[in-house]
């Protein structure tokens, strides 16, 4: 069957409006993607409905879900490791027991800020070109923390953002094919 890497966490980005967060959160005075108790109460409310539905779908319970994401590209947004830890702990509290991961750009500053490598949460990267260079940065980051984990590109970007009123961004097909070939040679494309 199909194995699933699930990204159910609070902020998913995925180029969705407001990163998938509900817009009504802006009506309440709170700091988003932080340990602000008002925000974390909303996270708890979300998780207490969603996560019990996902527990039986984990591979540890006979389902297809092999991994779940704690946060997406947090290192490009904030540096509050306590927020990442609280999110991880809530996931575990509600029964998530498959390997957890974070996903960030492949440069040291955002990996430092957006990962929980020190808590053994798997590190993945997001990129769509310069695969050898990005994989080397990730490998060096992991080695610095005593990890010999596989390199994994969680989001392989085959295009880029289009904005209203601007020309459509197109990527050359041969360029994309060459980049994918390079990533496959590195050995880790999700």
Task: Describe the residue ranges of each PLM region.
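Structural motif
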Residues: 60, 115, 183-184
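Active-site beta-loop-alpha junctions enriched in small/polar residues
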Residues: 9-13, 70-75, 103-107, 126-130, ...
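Hydrophobic faces of well-ordered beta-strands that scaffold small-molecule active sites
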Residues: 4-8, 66-70, 100-102, 123-125, ...
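Catalytic-core region of carbohydrate-active enzymes that cleave or remodel glycosidic bonds
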Residues: 2, 90-94, 130-190
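Short, hinge-like loop/turn segments at secondary-structure boundaries
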Residues: 21-26, 117-121, 170-171
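Substrate-binding cleft/loops of secretory-pathway carbohydrate-active enzymes
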Residues: 75-96, 104-142, 146, 168
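Structured loop/turn residues at beta-strand edges in well-structured enzyme cores
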Residues: 63, 118, 186-187
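Active-site mouth of glycoside hydrolases
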Residues: 1-98
């Amino acid at each position: 069957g199909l194995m699933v890497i699930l990204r159910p966490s609070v902020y998913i980005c995925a180029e969705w409006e407001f990163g998938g967060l509900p817009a009504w959160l802006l009506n309440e005075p709170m700091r988003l993607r932080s340990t602000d108790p008002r925000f974390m109460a909303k996270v708890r409310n979300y998780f207490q409905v969603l996560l019990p539905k996902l527990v039986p779908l984990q591979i540890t319970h006979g389902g297809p879900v092999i991994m779940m994401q704690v946060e997406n590209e947090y290192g490009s947004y904030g540096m509050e490791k306590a927020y990442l830890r609280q999110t991880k702990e809530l996931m575990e509290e509600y029964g998530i027991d498959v390997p957890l991961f974070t996903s960030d750009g492949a440069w040291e500053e955002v990996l430092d800020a957006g990962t929980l490598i020190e808590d053994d949460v798997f590190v993945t990267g997001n990129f769509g070109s310069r695969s050898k260079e990005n994989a080397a940065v990730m490998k060096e980051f992991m080695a610095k923390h005593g990890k010999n984990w596989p390199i994994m590109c969680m989001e392989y970007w085959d295009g880029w953002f289009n904005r209203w009123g601007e020309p459509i961004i197109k990527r050359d097909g041969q360029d994309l094919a060459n980049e994918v070939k390079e990533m496959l040679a590195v050995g880790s494309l999700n």
